Every structure is written in C-alpha cells, then in structure tokens.
Amino acid sequence: MKVILLENLRRIGSIGEIIDVKRGFARNFLISNKKALYASKENIAEVEKIKSELSKKDTEKKKEAQKISEQINNKEYEIKKLSTENKELYGSVKPTEISKLILENDKLDIKPSMIQPITEIKSIGKFKVKIILHSEVDSEITINVVTADTIQ
C-alpha cells in the first residue's frame, strides 16, 4: 500500500515521501496516528502544497526536542524500590515510572513510549536509559535504583 509521509520517521522516510508499506502498518499506525495519508492523486497534490508548512512544523518540533534534550541529557534520577537481599527488585522499573519521575523532578512531560531502557531494570544499581524525543534527537539519562525502606 502506498502512503505519503506527513512526518520524518526514523528508518521509514521523510516528509512528503511516497513509500510502500504493508496494509496493516499503514492503517493501524501511520494513518491512525496522522503520520501519513493514502497516496491518492488528491492527497499527493495537497501534500505538495503544504510540504513547506509541514517541514517548518517538524523543524519546530526538532528545536523543542533539542531544548528538552539539553535539559535532561546525562542527568541522573533516583528511584526507590523494594528489593530482596540479592539486590533483585520485586518487579521492575517501567517506562511509566521513569516518565513520572522526570515530570516530578524537571516538570517535563515525556511520554512512556519515548523511553527505551537499554537493559531491563530488575535489580539495584545504575542503568542507562535512552529517550527518543524526535526522529533525529535522542537523549540518554541514568536511573539509579536504590532500596526502599518501606512500601511506597
């Protein structure tokens, strides 16, 4: 199925590009999230008209992502979790918890889908976490997991 991209997407394409993708990916992800349009003659003409406007919006999003990246890049956050004597956690640290932690500390709204732990966080220690803020901008933070004395 041919679609026209409305955003720059990593490993997929850039704004205004006509690409061929599987039908399910187009319907369930690209079109439903307003990242692409069906490649009809009318849509191609419409995208050509608004291509410069779309690239300006993308540039603004990129600048905003770079500002956020400068604020949180290489920063360390501490989270307290219950653990065993072997320093293993009861459960794990999820992206939603990391998102709430960043919101509480820096007042930045980072969606859990942007957060990608490099390794699964299931024990006490320091872990690197990658945050993808834009298709061209990402940041790395450190999560320091310490033992909690009581249940929170």
Swiss-Prot record:
The gene is rplI. GO terms for biological process: translation. One of its GO terms (molecular function) is rRNA binding. The keyword Lipid biosynthesis does not apply. Belongs to the bacterial ribosomal protein bL9 family. The keyword Cell membrane does not apply. Pfam families: Ribosomal_L9_C (PF03948), Ribosomal_L9_N (PF01281). Keywords: Ribonucleoprotein, Ribosomal protein, RNA-binding, rRNA-binding. PANTHER family: 50S RIBOSOMAL PROTEIN L9 (PTHR21368). It comes from Pelagibacter ubique (strain HTCC1062). It comes from the Bacteria. This is Large ribosomal subunit protein bL9. GO terms for cellular component: ribonucleoprotein complex; ribosome. Binds to the 23S rRNA.
